[in-house]
A protein has these predicted regions:
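Cell wall/extracellular polymer interaction/catalysis modules
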Residues: 1-137, 144
C-alpha cells in the first residue's frame, strides 16, 4: 500500500541474517516502499524497533538541516536522534547512518559504509524538495 502524497513513510529494515559486525547493525532504508540505501547503527545504542515521527530541522551539532526522529510519547529533544553521515558504528551514538555497503577485494562484504556523505545529501535533498508538499514523515524501524 502506497501512502498518499502528503505523508512519507521511511522504513529501516534490519535483517538478523545480514552479516553485521560485533559493533554494528546493518539494514536497508526504504522510502514509500522503494529501496533507497543501506544503514548502519551502533549495536550498543541502536534505535528500538517502533514507530517514530521525523522533523527536518537544524542540527547545532552538524551545522545544517538533517532529519531528526522521535517517539511523540517519549520525546527527548536533547537526544537528537538523526540520520547522518558516518562510515562505522563508532560514528553513531543512537543515530542511523546512511550509505552503501561494499565488497572488499578479498570477496567479503565490508563492516563499514561508504559514500555516506553523498547518501546523506541525497536524503536531505528529498526533504528539501518535498518540504512544502509533504506534511508528515513517519519512520518505522523493524527487525525481521
Amino acid at each position: 500500500m502506497r501512502p498518499n502524497n502528503d505523508i512519507r513513510v521511511i522504513l529501516v529494515e534490519r535483517n538478523r541474517d545480514i552479516d553485521s559486525s560485533e559493533l554494528g547493525i546493518f539494514g536497508k532504508l526504504y522510502i514509500n516502499g522503494t529501496y533507497f540505501c543501506d544503514t548502519l547503527e551502533n549495536r550498543r545504542f541502536a534505535v528500538p524497533c517502533g514507530l517514530y515521527e521525523i522533523d527536518y530541522n537544524d542540527s547545532p551539532k552538524f551545522g545544517r538541516k538533517l532529519p531528526m526522529f522521535f517517539d511523540r510519547g517519549n520525546y527527548d529533544p536533547s537526544r537528537g536522534l538523526r540520520f547522518h553521515a558516518g562510515n562505522s558504528p563508532e560514528d553513531s551514538q543512537g543515530c542511523i547512518l546512511v550509505g552503501e555497503r561494499y565488497w572488499l577485494p578479498s570477496g567479503t562484504i565490508s563492516k563499514k559504509l561508504r559514500y555516506s556523505r553523498d547518501w546523506t545529501e541525497r536524503l536531505c535533498n528529498i526533504f528539501d524538495h518535498d518540504e512544502r508538499r509533504v506534511t508528515k514523515t513517519i519512520l518505522v524501524v523493524a527487525t525481521i
